[in-house]
């Protein structure tokens, strides 16, 4: 399946670095959204239109991801996408006109999607070699990266440091990190079976898994792009304070993911997801309808903690289905998830024009509640029908002595 690897720890660290990079650069864009909305005098609807740039770019990247992995391998694609993403983040953040922001988001969405697909294939490979559940911890580093990006950006905004300086620091640092990551990642020869233009979309046993990923990541995208604006609209806070809900959302998500593997071992995958999504529903209701800063922050923290393990668990399950290949299964699941991540904020912007932003958040909350029903119904049935040997989140073989730990 793959070439021999001498040192597992540096490889796992490289995959962690890829997830951290993607999360940090995402947080770097997100922290500037309220500022850009104010500087460019955008309405909720106009901002929603601009965010279509990221959605279109993401969808294009998802369509290209599977054949590009087949052509170049997940290692090369991951390295190249990380370098380019660190460079193009400047365009949406620093552009002086709405249409340039839109164009920048096209590029950002495209390369973010390529990085996400390729790093997830790498993570699935490392998890398989290690013969233990690691996907939640990998995604935990994405959340830590996002939290770090939002916190660092919010601090610089508070200190009134120029966005140009902010972006220069981020670009220089993460281009360096991306080059090191590229050097350390392993070749996965199974990648080469993904030849030709093959659009990855979840069908059969992957369909309910992909649906819950869609709902979970849609909610994550809405919180990322609109939580700060909701806080500014309802409580009139400044730009730095507006970054607080998403920062707490991310750190709560990171905590959930770092303890998620142990929670799954103790309580089971489906119970973990169902209880988590239910917690997210309660948190979103608090954040939306209780107009107090502390309660809003706590509510978004509950939402982050509750959503934290849904996507990692389901992506790990999809990778173990592996039909027709691991890369295809992961790409198919990630595709619909990231469609939710990037189209959710766009749709909420349009919906907010019609029914007001708090009510639009209520629609999102209803979607999360629907996810609970799907987990307890079709997905649980799928796990039982497919059998533990294919859908189990843990390899039944004993862990080797030269594991990634």
Task: Give the residues covered by each predicted segment.
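Pair of pore-lining "gating" transmembrane helices in MFS-fold secondary transporters
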Residues: 8-32, 106-107, 203-219, 301-305
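Short amphipathic helix-loop junctions that connect adjacent transmembrane helices
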Residues: 31-45, 225-241
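Helix-breaking motifs and short loop linkers at transmembrane-helix boundaries and internal kinks
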Residues: 41, 73, 94-99, 236, ...
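Helix-to-loop junctions at the C-terminal end of transmembrane segments
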Residues: 61-74, 157, 256-268, 352-353
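Primarily marks hydrophobic transmembrane alpha-helices of the MFS/SLC 12-helix fold
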Residues: 75-78, 273
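Helix-loop-helix hairpin linking two adjacent transmembrane segments in secondary transporters
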Residues: 100, 137-186
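Cytoplasmic helix-loop-helix junction between adjacent transmembrane helices
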Residues: 104-140
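C-terminal transmembrane helical hairpin of 12-TM major facilitator-type secondary transporters
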Residues: 267-314
